[in-house]
Amino acid sequence: MIRLTPTLLSFAILLFSIVKVSAQDTLGNIFDGPYLLYKGNQILVKEVTHSSKKVIATEKTYTLSEKQKLAIKVNFSDAPEKNFEVKLRSSLQNEPSVWAQPDKLLFLSDIEGEFDALRNLLLANKVINKKYEWIFGKGHLVICGDLFDRGKDVPATLWLLYKLEKAAKLKGGYVHTILGNHDIMNLAGNLKYLDQKYLSAAEAMGQSYMELYDENTELGRWLRSKNLIEKIGDNLCLHGGISPEINDLRLTVEQINTISKPYIGWKDLKNTVKDDKILKIFNSTLGLFWFRGYFKEPVLEETIVDQTLAQYQVKRIIVGHTITKTNVGFYYGGKILGIDVNQHEGQHEGALFEKGNWYKVDLTGNKKPIKVN
């Protein structure tokens, strides 16, 4: 029989604690939510607050009259210091499509539920502080699509952007959230890339996954207020790109967003919609959030890129969606800026426009001039 001395006992307890913490770190954030659903004159706030072998869900009910006083609490099982609260809006408005040129812009894309990547990039590049306060002044943060699917913290990512929108406005800045293919897929029920965590959590909460983001939810309404494309100063910003077929529609940025909004979240659009413009905009090869022609063979001819720049009266097109070894980088002599990097594999970078210059930025806060490939 082994007798533990006080010293050995203390060491054993310490070792057990380290193993327990390490296991928790490996799991990441096992919480999910919160999700805010509207049901009649009630507000339901649902979340998964604990999960090991069994998922345990909680639900709180409020009246609509309590909405303005309600604070949504976003909690993290693996790192409580990341917790934050969100005040709800009295109403949600569709985003404008065209903006004047800000003095400072930070572009990110394809976060896909990697909350830590988003948070750490914003901290390192002095967009927020650790209290989630906006410190980017009159600068604009632009997310070029894809908030959903592979990562473990999609709701937290959405709520953070929701929160920062108001914080930025109070300081003269702005947050632009542009939808990508993964966002459109989730809202329309195409869940082929969805992490199992979210399906298990939805089941535990007694909801279908689709009910967590439909028109009767706060996040669902918020997402449906977002654009597919925006013109910000000299920049045309979207997720995938502009194909020749989209150019041929001869639509303005405002027109694209206006006619597309009713179809965000539309199921089986290909077989139920006859409008040729809508079918092209949402096309899974040539559409705004799917097109890869700037990077994949056969690459688009530069004359087509020039046509797009002239048609929308911009100097460059900024896109995510397609990962290349040379991103964050310029292409076509600086006419295309590709910003998609592999967030899931630890490549966390973005593009910063400041004082008339373009920089690649990372988690250290370092700035390097963006190369032309």
Locate predicted features.
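Feature recognizes metal-dependent phosphohydrolase scaffolds
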Residues: 24-373
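Bacterial Sec-dependent N-terminal signal peptides
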Residues: 1-26
